[in-house]
Amino acid sequence: MAATMKKAAAEDVNVTFEDQQKINKFARNTSRITELKEEIEVKKKQLQNLEDACEDIMLADDDCLMIPYQIGDVFISHSQEETQEMLEEAKKNLQEEIDALESRVESIQRVLADLKVQLYAKFGSNINLEADES
């Protein structure tokens, strides 16, 4: 029992203000990554919906058909060709948003990797920076 107490005391590491700042930054960035990944999933679902709409419009045989397209809270009827162009533009914009979000996730992951190295170097097994898989 005394041996484990001495071992625990030997493993005690002082946590400085800078260390606490790094831990807090790690926690904030981990939370931010989770939020960004959820946002990416929502946007990917929206993109899939736009792609499905494009396919449905292509399958429509009637070129004279006026298709309602939602802009804000209103639906405006457009020709099949105009609607197709608007959907393609919306898909392009949404893909750019997804790419930007994924880029942000990658940059945050690099910061987290650097912080992990620094914190594990100082605290070793006294700190757990791995995400829960629950």
UniProtKB/Swiss-Prot annotation:
Instruction: Report the subcellular localization.
Output: Nucleus; Cytoplasm; Mitochondrion
User: One GO CC annotation, please?
Assistant: cytoplasm
Q: Which domain of life is it from?
A: Eukaryota
* Pfam families given in the database record: Prefoldin_2
Q: Which SUPFAM superfamilies match?
A: Prefoldin
Question: Where in the sequence is N-acetylalanine found?
Answer: A2
Instruction: Keyword check for Transmembrane helix, yes or no.
Output: no
- Kindly list the biological process annotations in GO that this record carries: protein folding
Q: Which residues carry the post-translational modification Phosphoserine, per the record?
A: S125
Question: Which InterPro entries does UniProt cross-reference here?
Answer: PFD_beta-like, PFDN4, Prefoldin
Q: Name one GO molecular function term.
A: unfolded protein binding
Instruction: Give the record's keywords alphabetically.
Output: Acetylation, Chaperone, Cytoplasm, Mitochondrion, Nucleus, Phosphoprotein
Primary place of residence? nucleus
- Which function does this protein serve? Binds specifically to cytosolic chaperonin (c-CPN) and transfers target proteins to it. Binds to nascent polypeptide chain and promotes folding in an environment in which there are many competing pathways for nonnative proteins.
* Similarity-based family: Belongs to the prefoldin subunit beta family.
Quaternary structure note? Heterohexamer of two PFD-alpha type and four PFD-beta type subunits. Interacts with URI1; the interaction is phosphorylation-dependent and occurs in a growth-dependent manner.
Q: What is this protein called?
A: Prefoldin subunit 4
